[in-house]
A protein has these predicted regions:
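Extended, low-hydrophobicity, polar/charged segments
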Residues: 1-159
Length: 159
């Protein structure tokens, strides 16, 4: 089970006890925000893409949307999201629980600047009913992200 892989991974950092599991689904931004009790923008949604360099996870704020022009400028190609089957095959996490943790070595992770507005954010932990509260610094470390990128739009910078 994917959440167990994430839990084992978090043990290395002493964070395994911080995973929250819910009776209800947290598979979408709205459901996760309700389960956690925060505004949707504070949910760190993980989107999976296939690039010429291989699979990639891009983590954005819950209110952010991919800006195709910015994406192409940063990554040099059009955004191509993974199908649910490919997301599971490449990341080990099913859609609804995709997260930037406990990933195969070939999966690159990038964090969008839309997350930096908040002192803490809530990414999933490998299942459709889990989350963890992390600072952006913790998210950067635990996700082993390669860099911060600016590839989103439609987010409210005043939140």
């Amino acid at each position: 089970m994917s959440i167990e892989k994430v839990r084992e991974y978090f043990k290395l950092y002493g964070k395994d006890g911080d995973i929250r599991e819910f009776a209800e689904s947290s598979a979408t931004v709205e459901l996760a925000a309700h389960a956690v009790g925060v505004i949707p923008a504070r949910i760190a949604k993980s989107m999976s893409f296939l690039t010429h360099e291989g699979p990639m996870i891009l983590v954005l704020a819950g209110d952010a949307r991919i800006d195709n022009k910015k994406y192409k400028s940063v990554f040099g190609e059009k955004a191509k999201m993974l199908s649910p089957e490919d997301a599971l095959a490449f990341t080990g996490h099913a859609v609804g629980g995709v997260c930037p943790f406990a990933l195969p070595e070939n999966v690159r992770v990038f964090l969008d600047v839309s997350l930096r507005r908040f002192p803490t954010v809530f990414p999933a932990c490998g299942s459709s009913n889990s989350a963890i509260e992390l600072t952006c610094g913790e998210l950067e470390t635990l996700s082993r992200s390669l860099s911060w990128v600016d590839v989103a739009n439609s987010w409210d910078p005043t939140l």
